[in-house]
């Protein structure tokens, strides 16, 4: 009976998520300009980056910007709250939403202006309707953010299903991949590298770092081991989505400011066609992944919990000493996970510089890696829902 009930709740959540995805697919097919392929012949990774945050630049549609501005706003808020996590946890849901929406609108205005300016530069549209197009793109972004937010409450995995759908759509739009003209040996090498990368990602996602501690409530004769478990990469696939959205937004803002100032400066070094641009992104990915992981682990909160319930790490004293101990362990775990994920992303990115004629195929492989990583996270989230639904009646009594 309980099992039927828990599956019924899960089915309702999945059904709601499917409804959200139908709205997203419908909106992403509403073209607001009758032209296609603005980026078809250049900056393939720019399209990939935008598709990784739920956007689509194959055509200018309602959801072209995706969730990029929102994810970037989350980074800004996370950095502001990082110094004082206690105050951040005391904020109400409406306060958090208010800050997120304001910053999201500002970033969406910047990004929409850059995208439309690119269309004008390529003579796809006239500059007379730029304000209207910006309004549509910003409104579309805010609608998509609202859908993702509703999916967090009533669906599964928040923004991840939207990004997953965007990636699948992007893979099908990549027609060049199906016209390969490379040697069999090179193709086998690419496939083997892809499989190895996926296995490493799976290892990272399933690995845990465990810290044994003494539980004062565990008085049984056959004592089961008690430990604090952290994932090797606590940030998961969301760190890749956030780093890509921040990179795209920074790139857009720098180019936009240069255009407004009338500068003819060449910012090719910020693109993925340049090793400096790739290095900048890899460093950004490592730093943001580390910060997000530390934010999620929240060692100060865990140290306070141990101080209140009496549990301790032998021979560490409770309180500040426990917090310092947890911080040292958390730094090791978070840096390791962040660097490993960044290295997996760095290999295909630098490969595009060594074999430029295979850049589209390599980007395709990278999209596939990210797609599988997000799928793993979605699968784990579903298992978590089933676990908590199974014990929901007990948890509601005491929580």
Swiss-Prot record:
SUPFAM superfamilies: Preprotein translocase SecY subunit. The chain crosses the membrane at residues 14-34, 60-80, 102-122, 128-148, 152-172, 184-204, 238-258, 272-292, 335-355, 362-382. It is found in: Cell membrane. Keywords: Cell membrane, Membrane, Protein transport, Translocation, Transmembrane, Transmembrane helix, Transport. Signal peptide: none annotated. It holds the Pfam family SecY. Its main location: membrane. It comes from the Bacteria. GO terms for biological process: intracellular protein transmembrane transport; protein targeting. GO terms for cellular component: plasma membrane. It is a multi-pass membrane protein. HAMAP family: SecY2. Part of the accessory SecA2/SecY2 system specifically required for export of possible cell wall proteins. The central subunit of a protein translocation channel. Component of the accessory SecA2/SecY2 protein translocase complex required to export cell wall proteins. May form heterotrimers with SecE and SecG subunits. Belongs to the SecY/SEC61-alpha family. SecY2 subfamily. This is Accessory Sec system protein translocase subunit SecY2. It comes from Staphylococcus haemolyticus (strain JCSC1435).
């Amino acid at each position: 009976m309980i099992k039927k009930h828990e599956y019924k709740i899960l089915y309702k959540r999945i059904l709601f998520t499917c409804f959200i995805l139908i709205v997203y697919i419908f909106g992403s097919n509403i073209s607001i300009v009758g032209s296609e392929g603005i980026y078809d012949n250049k900056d393939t990774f720019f399209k990939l980056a935008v598709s990784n945050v739920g956007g689509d630049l194959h055509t200018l549609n309602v959801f072209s910007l995706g969730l990029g501005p929102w994810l970037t706003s989350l980074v800004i808020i996370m950095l502001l709250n990082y110094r004082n996590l206690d105050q951040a946890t005391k904020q109400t849901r409406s306060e958090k939403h208010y800050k997120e929406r304001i910053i999201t609108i500002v970033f969406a205005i910047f990004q929409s202006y850059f995208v439309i300016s690119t269309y004008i530069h390529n003579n796809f549209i006239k500059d007379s309707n730029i304000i209207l197009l910006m309004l549509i793109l910003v409104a579309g972004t805010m609608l998509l953010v609202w859908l993702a937010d509703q999916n967090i409450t009533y669906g599964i995995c928040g923004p991840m299903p939207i990004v997953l759908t965007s990636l699948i759509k992007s893979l099908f739009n990549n027609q060049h991949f199906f016209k390969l003209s490379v040697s069999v040996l090179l193709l086998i090498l690419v496939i083997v590298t892809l499989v190895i990368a996926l296995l490493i990602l799976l290892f990272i996602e399933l690995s845990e770092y465990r810290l044994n501690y003494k539980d004062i409530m565990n008085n049984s004769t056959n004592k089961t081991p008690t430990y604090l478990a952290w994932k090797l990469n606590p940030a998961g696939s969301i760190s890749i989505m956030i780093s890509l959205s921040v990179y795209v937004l920074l790139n857009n803002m720098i180019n936009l400011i240069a255009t407004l100032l009338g500068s003819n400066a060449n910012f090719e070094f910020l693109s993925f066609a340049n090793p400096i641009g790739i290095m900048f992104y890899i460093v950004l990915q490592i730093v943001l992944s580390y910060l997000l992981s530390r934010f999620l682990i929240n060692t100060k909160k865990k140290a306070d919990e141990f101080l209140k319930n009496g549990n301790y790490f032998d021979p560490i004293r409770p309180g500040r000493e426990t917090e310092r101990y947890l911080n040292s362990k958390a730094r090791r775990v978070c840096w390791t996970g962040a660097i490993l994920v960044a290295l997996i992303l760095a290999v295909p990115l630098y490969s595009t510089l060594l074999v430029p004629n295979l850049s589209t195929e390599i980007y395709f492989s990278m999209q596939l890696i990210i797609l599988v990583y997000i799928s793993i996270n979605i699968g784990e989230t579903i298992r978590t829902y089933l676990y908590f639904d199974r014990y929901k009646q007990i948890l509601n009594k005491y929580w």
